[in-house]
Amino acid sequence: MEENRPVEQTRLISKPKIVVTRKLPEPIETRMMELFDARLNLEDIPLTRDELLMAVQTAEILIPTVTDNIDSEIINSAGSQLRMIANFGVGVDHINLSSAALKDIIVTNTPDVLTQDTADLTMALILMTPRRMGEGERIVRNSEWTGWTPTHLMGHRINGKRLGIIGMGRIGTAVAERARGFGLTVHYHNRNRVTDEIESKLEATYWDSLDQMLAHMDIVVITCPSTPATFHLLSERRLQLLQPNCFIVNTSRGNIIDEKALLTMLESGAIAGAGLDVFENEPIIDPKFLKMENVVILPHLGSATIEGRIAMGECVIVNAKSFVDGHKPPNRVLATLL
């Protein structure tokens, strides 16, 4: 196969070999077996680093997930047959895009199809955290509920509160739409300001300064992607700008928040609480989080619906099949965009 050919002219042989690093929904695996020479992970045990290194020696298309660290070493060790990394998921912070570009390896992701599910979960955390639902559920499960009292587990009203969204892309916009239905006032900080039409529809206020927005919000939600520019975007300094009655919700990536600084703020009562679906070193979670009653914690469930995961798999197949057929994949990710 010639190197450096444009995507439109690249055509792999029939039944190209693909390696899928995790178990996917059954309908997706069945379709992949029909279209490709597919090596599946039926036991759903994460591949070791050595197994990943072996996979890129034989696969023409690698289909990884967020749990796979496809760094420069993995990519540089790949054989010349590896032409595509078709990621199962929208986030690609676990893939070294620059190294892939240098080897003319196409990278794709699965945007759009998980927007609504992730926004739903984000809205759930926005509701659960101030209303202390996690605490209440634990009390009932542990048979500790002694009955209703006027002052038991009093949380904070959602209606009328100021919601600050960091990252007004697809998911951030979908969260804003839901938040309006609960009477929250929408504020946002984004790399680029959204259109007047979207701002008007959402009655959203744009803040050019993230620092200033943080200092005025009741709830802060992180929906921006993880990139080198957003690593520890909520640093210790920025976390200290938050009001004591502020709640933080993160359904993006754990490394966008300085987790140690967040723990310190939560322990001291400098902020009111947090709703977290992602963690900096997941699945390893700092045990301090587990003991905090003012923290709602979930195991990275953002897009975890049957419909969403099947749609993500279908998107992977479309990307891979387009490439195999010599066409430009619809969801190509370029290193320059990040």
Q: Where are the regions a protein language model picked out?
A:
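Rossmann-like adenosine-cofactor binding region
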Residues: 70-73, 192-288
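N-terminal glycine-/charge-rich "phosphate-binding" loop or analogous flexible N-terminal tail
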Residues: 1-59, 183, 324
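Hydrophobic/small residue at the entry helix of a nucleotide-binding pocket
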Residues: 171
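Phosphate/diphosphate ligand-binding glycine-rich loop within oxidoreductases
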Residues: 59-141, 155
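Conserved N-terminal Rossmann-fold NAD(P)-binding element of oxidoreductases
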Residues: 21, 164-166
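Phosphate-binding beta-alpha-beta segment of Rossmann-like dinucleotide-binding domains, i.e.
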Residues: 111-162, 174-177, 181, 188-191, ...
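Short, well-ordered coil/turn residues at beta-beta hairpins
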Residues: 21, 65, 88, 223-226, ...
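C-terminal helix-to-coil terminal segments
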Residues: 2-16, 108-121, 148, 154, ...
